[in-house]
Swiss-Prot record:
This is 1,4-alpha-glucan branching enzyme GlgB. Monomer. GO terms for cellular component: cytosol. One of its GO terms (biological process) is glycogen biosynthetic process. It comes from Aliivibrio fischeri (strain ATCC 700601 / ES114) (Vibrio fischeri). Catalyzes the formation of the alpha-1,6-glucosidic linkages in glycogen by scission of a 1,4-alpha-linked oligosaccharide from growing alpha-1,4-glucan chains and the subsequent attachment of the oligosaccharide to the alpha-1,6 position. PANTHER family: 1,4-ALPHA-GLUCAN-BRANCHING ENZYME. The gene is glgB. Belongs to the glycosyl hydrolase 13 family. GlgB subfamily. Keywords: Carbohydrate metabolism, Glycogen biosynthesis, Glycogen metabolism, Glycosyltransferase, Transferase. Disulfide bonds: none annotated.
Length: 715
């Protein structure tokens, strides 16, 4: 029997009230029950008869009109009575087409949501379950409520490849999964809800019904702030892994609420404008750092509930800190409870491994050519802005999405219809996602981690671009780190390495990123990349940080760089906070704090981060002394001179030609004693002299401390 195998796609045609010409046949399926009664409209009871042919089926044949009548089942389980509301009396629960195909609506309907149905003039509360599994032959909702028995709550196949069931009395906290059978009736692993708002950890990986409307936000002032042009703002991001920034005294994770209590004051003190969280979407393997997500609609329950995460964002906003999330639409893991082989087919990925499998990451690649995949991912992007008030998404591994031959040899990939290597489906997805985000949330930002020279990543879609607000400048990161790791005596031979990023600095809206990618897999810490002894390492890092903050582009530091952490990042521990008791580490922390303050308060350092008009070389080709000098310009004539000396030799009486006459005052020196520097004597004010230098009619004379970056402001 199909019911016994939970292999039934149309349970409403057999179960619940079956209307005939003169009578109503009520049929229920309760395997294991001893007897069943039905109570109509709260008072009239009838005994159902057991079907002698099929154990577990109980039938009532009476000349009664059950149209719109609410009834309950009184079930005897071998001496234990249970009263249940029969889900098969509720037929009209289908969503509209727009609700399941409009990205901004989908997350409010697909999955498990609190739902009310009117029967007999009263509101019946429960949960409506909707799952997209077009190739499944049957689907059931399973959980503690039915002992995880897929025979008890078989779903109805409706339009659009959806399965639906309304279960009365289900509420927030109900644990559930979907039991699906493949196209040929084959059993599949139990599946987490792809739209689940809350999920349990190993071993159950169960989804949990959640009410996303219950949290009371207090960030109205932040949400209603005027829309601004982000390219003109000072943006300084602190990239963070929630599980390893800091642990409690027992070595356990901080909760989202504890993180709010401890992290937010730190961010305020350090002067960062935004927290960028590595992925918080639910992921089964902690060691993936979130980059192998399964529950895309659920903040990981390792650190608390969805409301706890909302509290974290809320608290950030109340003190003026923005929150950006890493988002992973490039691939998904092969864990059996996730999207892999979801309905017995490659529903979310291309079945051909040359397009659907990523060998490097041992994960599936989304099939962006499929409309339902694009809808799913765009809906997820909007969901985080709508329900969690986030301020931006940093999209991971964009290059792997754009190119069909990404990390593949000849013969390992399939060209597109033009014979080329561009993934047109992925390009369409990214454009659509960006258009939807900026349309609905004009104060938002989207950021691409894109490691190639794909054109127009941060250009608007109407101009042929992908539509991102910003792009990580990974070329700058690699080139500048390659330069700074050279021994100072050899840097003159690599001078072009440090100057080359300025050739393309304004081809995109760039963020200069010192990300987690540079402190993992044996790469050591940022400090460890610096040459020399302990003092020289720290001095090099101070000079490098100063150079970074003086360059055009927004700023991003991964946690730990600001205290000159000596060890490579360890996701199983916490940052080396004990190092801040030592002068060179506390000094570095003070320098980064002051650099953030300088960057966010001096318009010349941020207003034209993305415009060529905001940058002028003063000294580009001084390779022999490894000195670089440039000016940053603001909208109203503000000028700041930034000079870096990347050798341990001080440069006294150093003359620089200046285009504007006047007095230049020292506003930051990375070699100052309170940063742990040598405190080499410097000139605090330099006035231009009518002495030609570097082709300019006037010049100033300054002193450059060893391994330093200095900032001078035109008064």
């Amino acid at each position: 029997m199909q019911l016994e195998r939970a292999a039934f796609s149309d349970p409403f045609s057999f179960l619940g009230p079956q209307y005939q010409s003169q009578t109503t046949a009520l049929r229920v399926w309760l395997p294991g029950a001893t007897s069943v009664k039905v109570r109509l409209s709260g008072h009239v009871e009838y005994q159902l008869l057991s079907d002698p042919r099929h154990s577990g089926i109980f039938v009532l044949n009476e000349s009664i009109d059950m149209t719109e009548v609410h009834y309950e089942l009184i079930i005897d389980w071998s001496g234990t009575e249970q009263i249940l509301d029969d889900p098969y009396q509720y037929h009209d629960i289908s969503p509209t087409d727009a609700q399941v195909h409009t990205p901004k609506e989908m997350y409010n309907h697909l999955g498990a949501h609190l739902f009310n149905v009117v029967r007999d003039g009263k509101q019946i509360q429960g949960v409506r379950y909707l799952v997209f599994a077009p190739n499944a032959s049957s689907a059931s909702v399973i959980g503690d409520f039915n002992q995880w028995d897929g025979r008890r709550h078989i779903m109805q196949r409706i339009d659009n490849g959806l399965w639906a069931l309304f279960i009365p009395e289900h509420a927030v906290g109900t644990k559930y999964k979907f039991e699906l059978k493949g196209p040929n009736g084959e059993s599949l692993p139990h599946k987490m809800d792809p739209y689940g708002a809350h999920n349990e950890q190993y071993p159950s990986f169960a989804s949990v019904v959640y009410d996303q409307t219950s949290y009371q936000w207090n960030d109205a002032k932040w949400q209603q702030r005027p829309v601004t042009e982000k390219q003109k703002e000072a943006l300084s991001f602190y990239e963070l892994h929630a599980g390893s920034w800091k642990r409690n005294e027992n070595g356990d994770f901080l909760t989202y609420r504890e993180l709010a209590e401890q992290l937010i004051p730190y961010i305020l003190d350090m002067g960062y404008t935004h927290i960028e969280l590595m992925p918080v979407s639910e992921h089964p393997f902690y060691g993936s750092w979130g980059y192998q997500p399964i529950g895309l609609f659920s903040p990981t329950s390792r650190f608390g509930t969805p409301d706890d995460f909302k509290y974290f964002v809320d608290q950030c906003h109340q003190v003026g800190i923005g929150v950006v999330l890493d988002w992973v639409p490039a691939h998904f893991p092969s864990d059996s409870h996730g999207l892999a082989n979801f309905d017995g087919t490659s529903l979310f990925n291309d079945p051909d491994p040359r397009r659907g499998w990523h060998n490097d990451w041992q994960s599936f690649i989304y099939n962006y050519d499929q409309p339902h995949v694009r809808e799913f991912l765009v809906s997820n992007a909007l969901y985080w802005f709508e329900h969690f008030h986030i301020d931006g998404l940093r999209v991971d591994a964009v290059a792997s999405m754009l190119y069909l031959d990404y990390s593949r040899n000849d013969g390992e990939w399939i060209p597109n219809w033009e014979g080329g290597n561009h993934n047109h489906g992925a390009i369409a997805l990214l454009k659509w996602m960006n258009e939807e985000v900026y349309s609905h949330y004009p104060n938002a930002m989207t950021i691409a981690e894109e490691s190639t020279a794909f054109p127009g990543v941060s250009a608007p879609t109407f101009a042929g671009g992908l539509g991102f607000g910003f792009k990580w400048n990974m070329g700058w990161m690699h080139d500048s780190l390659n330069y700074i790791r050279e021994d100072p005596i050899h840097r003159k031979y690599h001078h072009d390495t440090i100057t080359f990023p300025l050739v393309y600095a304004f081809s995109e809206n760039f963020i200069l990123s010192l990300s987690h990618d540079e402190v993992v897999y044996g790469k050591g810490s940022i400090l460890d990349k610096m040459p020399g002894d302990e003092w020289q390492k720290t001095a090099n890092l101070r000079a490098y940080m100063g150079y970074m903050y003086g360059q055009p582009g927004k700023k991003l530091n991964f946690m730990g760089a600001e205290i000159a952490q000596s060890a490579e990042w360890d996701h199983d521990g916490q940052l080396q906070w004990f190092l801040t008791q030592f002068e060179r580490h506390s000094g570095m922390q003070s320098l980064v704090r002051d650099l953030n303050k300088l960057y966010t308060t001096e318009p010349a350092l941020y207003q034209k981060d993305c415009e060529p008009a905001g940058f002028e070389w003063r000294l580009q080709d001084e390779a022999e002394m490894s000195v670089l000098a440039h000016e940053r310009l603001g909208d109203n004539g503000e000028r700041i001179l930034v000079v870096s000396n990347f050798t341990p030799a001080p440069r006294e009486d150093f003359r620089l030609g200046m285009p504007v006459a006047g007095q230049y005052e020292l506003i930051l020196n990375s070699d100052a004693h309170f940063y742990g520097g040598s405190d080499y004597s410097v000139i605090s004010e330099a006035s231009t002299e009518k002495v030609e230098s570097q082709g300019l009619a006037q010049s100033i004379v300054i002193t450059l401390p060893p391994l330093s970056t200095v900032f001078y402001r035109l008064k």
